Amino acid sequence: MKTYKFPVVVEQDEDGVYIGLVPDLKGCHTQAKTLSALDRRLKEAIALCLQVERRGFHQNKFVGLRQVEMTV
């Protein structure tokens, strides 16, 4: 077995629901009402996404996140 560390983007919507997005895995995301539930669901979602992407999976090096603010 191989151990992976995935960066996860966590956002909170207008209803207070947490949304977790895994940029390294196409289409891999989940949501939950609490952060602890989100962590559990993220592990489940990542495991499922890895099963799908097992053949061509390449993990990029995580550099960081930025928040860009602009007025248009």
Name these PLM-found stretches:
Residues 22-25, 43:
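ATP/adenylate-binding site constellation spanning eukaryotic-like Ser/Thr protein kinases
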Residues 26-36:
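A short, exposed loop/beta-hairpin motif centered on an aromatic-Gly-Thr core
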